[in-house]
């Protein structure tokens, strides 16, 4: 019977006989004495086997990496000069008396301590990959976060209630994962994109405070921080306003960080959405980076430089500057790389001015400003740019000029890239946790392809008080009672006060050009129940995967999920998705128009 975990044996066990079980992490033969580093989920302990115990020695001699062993022996001090203060077990070793080979192991596809493994190899051999200490630490922290959330919400009076995994398909932005019904031929369930409507119905039912940690599913194009199935910390509460909900969830985030990382997050400042977009080009600004946009649209309306003037005059156009301290030393190669980078976001180029002498702002050949565009701008404009940006000698000023969406995304991404690459050495990056709330989101945004307004969050978000009439008369300026929790440039949680009156919900649907017939067909179960005395309610959902990725510093969200999908929504371990036989399809009343094609990742 095991008495101790390997990684938890310390000097307090000196002289005691212990039994440990785990995997051979490393085996070394030193002049007739065999050393085995035995590993389990808690860490590694060094085991010494000498020829005086012939049976144990023979077992150790036959063992190889990843063999599963049970070892009984006496705990003793390591010899002087061989200790490792970074490990709990670093000052002791076990002198083995008995060794039982519990299982042999084939040679693994990579060494457990190898850090240079391609992600595809890791995901194909995920079980072996999960043995690596970094993956064990990541998933242990994930567990600690989830348990911390449960403890906090339980103490706040929230009730854990499960909502259905098989539900009806409703439009919430992304495509649904559909599940054909065998019992009802030609009809489909959908896997939930979120428990949104069910948690609102739980409030109507009178449960007051609900939460669950649940799986959600979205069939969308994947990015580094997205998975087709993901885990959400979901909560909803009745009779509280947005300030009260933000206070509760902010307290939860602080408690989780304190318990898991011993980090004090401090207070969360609040920033209106309009301010976030104006200064940072993003609704999730990374406040570790002390760089801001400077608005130049008004200034460029009177300039002759076509690139800037055209953007300033176009409907929805924008011209901004981004001053980077000490950036004049950027090489031509670096600027070319940044130009290529902003092109990913639709920018057609990247204009810049290097400030060599802010006292000489002419646009002639002797100018203290170095740039191909200086000669196209008036001296008044150059002076105004320097004043507005507060540029100093040695700075560089980058420019974005295009539709506001392109400028915000391109220059916003450039701000992050430059800040992370050069900010620490030049005083505009602070390596600490920087949380905030982004509030006062627009209720709607215009979708040019669909030629109509769509909901920024979802169509169940309540308009800000006094903005209800704007839903019809001026939807572009209608604000929502929505709020996002942002941490170091990541949205880790988003929520809103919901619509609790059926008539107001109908107005929102009308503003979104959803007909009464479509409203009833898709959302009748919600509208019908809102009529039975629905309380004011609101909530928030955290992305657990994203939160743990931030807390661990993992490179990818896939490093904090036990069995993730690739960016092509495949599981390389199980080879899913896979084709099914015709009998299964017939039982579901389905016939494929196109057979499966080979798209598996190599």
UniProtKB/Swiss-Prot annotation:
An annotated GO cellular component of this protein is:
cytoplasm
Q: Kindly state which keywords UniProt assigns to this record, in alphabetical order.
A: Aminoacyl-tRNA synthetase, ATP-binding, Cytoplasm, Ligase, Nucleotide-binding, Protein biosynthesis
- Superkingdom, taxonomy of origin: Bacteria
Q: Give the primary localization class.
A: cytoplasm
List residues binding L-aspartate: 172, 218, 457, 498
Could you confirm whether the keyword Membrane appears in this record? Answer: no
Q: Give binding positions for ATP.
A: 218-220, 227, 491, 543-546
PROSITE patterns on file = AA_TRNA_LIGASE_II (PS50862)
Keyword Protease set for record: no
E.C. number(s) listed in UniProt = 6.1.1.23
**Where is the stretch described as Aspartate?**
196-199
What does it catalyze? Answer: tRNA(Asx) + L-aspartate + ATP = L-aspartyl-tRNA(Asx) + AMP + diphosphate
- Enumerate the Gene Ontology biological process terms: aspartyl-tRNA aminoacylation
Location of the protein in the cell? Cytoplasm
- Example of a GO MF term: nucleic acid binding
InterPro entries, per database record: Aa-tRNA-synt_II, aa-tRNA-synth_II, aa-tRNA-synth_II/BPL/LPL, Asp-tRNA-ligase_1, Asp-tRNA-ligase_1_N, Asp/Asn-tRNA-synth_IIb, AspRS_core, GAD-like_sf
**Membrane spanning residue stretches:** none
Site for Important for tRNA non-discrimination, residues: 30, 81
Extract the HAMAP family matched here. Answer: Asp_tRNA_synth_type1
What is this protein for, i.e. what is its function? Answer: Aspartyl-tRNA synthetase with relaxed tRNA specificity since it is able to aspartylate not only its cognate tRNA(Asp) but also tRNA(Asn). Reaction proceeds in two steps: L-aspartate is first activated by ATP to form Asp-AMP and then transferred to the acceptor end of tRNA(Asp/Asn).
Subunit text: Homodimer.
Please give the family membership noted in the entry. Belongs to the class-II aminoacyl-tRNA synthetase family. Type 1 subfamily.
**What NCBIfam families does this protein map onto?**
aspS_bact, PRK00476.1
Supply the name of the protein.
Aspartate--tRNA(Asp/Asn) ligase
Q: Which organism is it from?
A: Neisseria gonorrhoeae (strain NCCP11945)
């Amino acid at each position: 019977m095991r008495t101790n975990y390997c990684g938890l044996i310390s000097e307090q066990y000196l002289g005691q006989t212990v039994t440990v079980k785990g995997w051979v992490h490393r085996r070394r033969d030193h002049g007739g004495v065999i050393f085995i580093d035995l590993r389990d989920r808690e860490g590694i302990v060094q085991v010494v086997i000498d020829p005086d115990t012939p049976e144990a020695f023979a077992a150790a001699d036959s063992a190889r990496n990843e063999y599963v062993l049970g070892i009984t022996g006496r705990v003793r001090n390591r010899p002087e000069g061989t200790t490792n203060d970074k490990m709990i077990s670093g000052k002791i070793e076990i002198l083995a008396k008995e060794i039982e080979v519990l299982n042999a192991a084939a040679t693994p596809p990579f060494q457990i301590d190898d850090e240079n493994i391609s992600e595809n190899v890791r995901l194909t051999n995920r079980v072996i990959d999960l043995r690596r200490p970094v993956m064990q630490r990541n998933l242990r922290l994930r567990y600690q976060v989830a348990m911390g959330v449960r403890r906090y919400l339980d103490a706040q009076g929230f009730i854990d209630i499960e909502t259905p995994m098989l539900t009806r398909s409703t439009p919430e932005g992304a495509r649904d994962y559909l599940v054909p019904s065998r019992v009802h031929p030609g009809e489909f369930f959908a896997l939930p994109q979120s428990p949104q409507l069910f948690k609102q119905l739980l409030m109507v039912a009178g449960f007051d405070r609900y939460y669950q940690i649940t799986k959600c599913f979205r069939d969308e194009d994947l990015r580094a921080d997205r998975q087709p199935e993901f885990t959400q910390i979901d909560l909803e509460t009745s009779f509280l306003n947005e300030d009260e909900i933000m206070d509760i969830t902010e307290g939860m985030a602080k408690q989780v960080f304190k318990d898991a990382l011993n980090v004090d997050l401090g207070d969360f400042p609040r920033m209106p959405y309009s301010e976030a977009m104006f200064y940072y080009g993003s609704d999730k600004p990374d406040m570790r980076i002390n760089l801001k946009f400077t608005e130049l649209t008004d200034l460029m309306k009177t300039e002759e430089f076509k690139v800037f003037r055209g953007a300033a005059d176009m409907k929805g156009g924008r011209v901004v500057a981004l001053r980077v301290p000490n950036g004049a030393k950027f090489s031509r190669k670096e600027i070319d790389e940044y130009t290529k980078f902003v092109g990913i976001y639709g920018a057609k180029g990247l204009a810049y001015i290097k400030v060599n002498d802010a006292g000489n702002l002419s646009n002639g050949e002797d100018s203290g400003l170095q740039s191909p565009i200086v000669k196209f701008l008036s001296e008044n404009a150059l002076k105004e740019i320097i004043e507005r940006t507060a540029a100093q000698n040695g700075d560089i000023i980058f420019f974005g000029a295009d539709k506001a969406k392109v400028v915000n995304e391109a220059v916003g991404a450039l701000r992050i890239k430059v800040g992370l690459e050069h900010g620490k050495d030049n005083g505009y990056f602070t390596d600490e946790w920087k949380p905030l709330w982004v509030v006062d989101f627009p209720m709607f945004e215009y979708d040019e392809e669909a030629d109509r307004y769509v909901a920024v969050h979802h169509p169940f978000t309540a308009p800000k008080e006094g903005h209800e009439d704007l839903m019809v008369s001026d939807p572009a300026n209608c604000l929502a009672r929505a709020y996002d929790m942002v941490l170091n440039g990541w949205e880790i949680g988003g929520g809103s006060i919901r619509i609790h009156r059926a008539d107001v919900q109908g107005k929102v649907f009308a503003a979104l050009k959803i007909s009464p017939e479509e409203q009833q067909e898709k959302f009748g179960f919600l509208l019908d129940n809102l009529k039975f005395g629905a309380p004011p309610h609101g909530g928030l959902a955290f992305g657990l995967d994203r939160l743990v990725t931030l807390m661990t510093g993992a490179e990818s969200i896939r490093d904090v999920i036990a069995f993730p999908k690739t960016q092509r929504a495949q599981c390389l371990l199980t080879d899913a998705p896979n084709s099914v036989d015709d009998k299964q399809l017939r039982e579901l009343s389905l016939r494929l128009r196109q057979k499966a094609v080979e798209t598996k990742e190599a």
